[in-house]
């Protein structure tokens, strides 16, 4: 009976990890939650094993130890969150991003009309769905993923997005061949193309079990805390997942930047781990636009401390809502007001 209980607990722990995929890293909030769940599970097992009723709880030394560990975890997490916040680290947050002033007309060269993105993401999604609807041999099995990553492909601004399985049943019937294509949209000309692959993609967000891209990455890099993944293609059209790795520069949970990048071939699942400075030239989305905007907002609003950013707001600068992209010199630039 005891062996069965132990096996059951181990299975529960394993299933919880397999489903939630927390990084084994003290900087990951999910890891702290995982530890809390483990301690609570240990308390439940201890109570059942000792057959304790609620009146015995106060007298049980073993249970007191377990609950003490739980209290330490909760207090440490709360303290770590507070001590990592901009409230007590305004200067450190303000210095996360190095900003250089420039002259727009000199720093940004004049672009030809066919290099300026005229479509936003919502418009790209409409074009992608329309293209997918015309593919009678695929439309019943696949849909277009909502990712639509903005990249610079052969000096043109394009958005790319993989197809995804229309349902779990469609995954079972098509998993052997994988996902056969991705959508590519020229953001300047509106030309929309469904690019078919010689071999299907077998590591995607819509795959299940060990072929799910998040699970695949977690088992290969158990300690890495990944930022939002983006879908890109190299200059030959090979599909990849670009997986930025977060670095926490302030306390346990604050001051997020990007330290490394993992590239995962969406067809084979092969991965390569790079430092940011060594990332291949074709990769465009090491830093997400949201992260860059957040870092600039820290720089612009925290010059005179946190409370000034909330109350007096002297000398505070913040970005306007929304942003867009420019493709310049094989790079993607984010611009906003």
Protein language model annotation of sequence segments:
Residues 2-337:
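Soluble extracytoplasmic regions of secretory-pathway and membrane proteins
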């Amino acid at each position: 009976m005891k062996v069965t209980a132990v096996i059951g607990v181990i299975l529960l722990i394993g299933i919880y990890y397999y489903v939630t995929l927390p990084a084994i890293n003290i900087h990951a909030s999910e890891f702290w939650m995982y530890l809390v769940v483990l301690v609570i599970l240990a308390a439940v097992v201890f109570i059942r094993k000792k057959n304790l009723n609620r009146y015995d709880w106060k007298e049980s030394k073993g249970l007191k130890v377990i609950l003490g560990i739980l209290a330490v975890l909760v207090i440490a997490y709360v303290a770590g969150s507070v001590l990592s916040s901009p409230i007590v680290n305004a200067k450190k947050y303000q210095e996360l991003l190095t900003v250089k002033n420039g002259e727009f007309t000199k720093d940004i060269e004049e672009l030809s009309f066919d290099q300026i993105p005229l479509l936003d993401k919502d418009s790209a999604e409409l074009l992608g769905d329309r293209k997918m609807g015309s593919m009678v041999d695929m439309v019943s099995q696949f849909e277009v993923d909502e990712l639509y990553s903005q990249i610079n492909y052969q000096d043109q601004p394009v958005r790319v997005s993989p197809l995804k399985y229309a349902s779990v049943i469609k995954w079972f019937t098509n998993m052997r061949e994988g996902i056969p294509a991705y959508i590519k949209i020229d953001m300047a000309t509106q030309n929309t193309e469904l690019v078919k692959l010689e071999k299907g993609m077998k590591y995607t967000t819509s795959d299940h079990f060990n072929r799910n891209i998040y699970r695949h990455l977690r088992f290969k890099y158990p300690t890495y805390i990944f930022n939002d993944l983006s879908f890109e293609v190299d200059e030959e059209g090979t599909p990849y997942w670009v997986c930025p790795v977060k670095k926490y520069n302030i306390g346990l949970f604050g001051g997020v930047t990007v330290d490394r990048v993992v590239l995962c071939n969406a067809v084979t699942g092969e991965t390569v781990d790079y430092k940011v400075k060594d990332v291949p030239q074709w990769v465009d989305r090491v830093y997400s636009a949201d992260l860059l905007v957040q870092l600039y907002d820290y720089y612009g609003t925290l010059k005179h401390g946190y409370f000034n950013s909330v109350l007096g707001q002297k000398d505070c600068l913040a970005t306007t809502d929304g942003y867009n992209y420019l493709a310049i010199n094989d790079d993607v630039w984010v611009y906003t007001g």
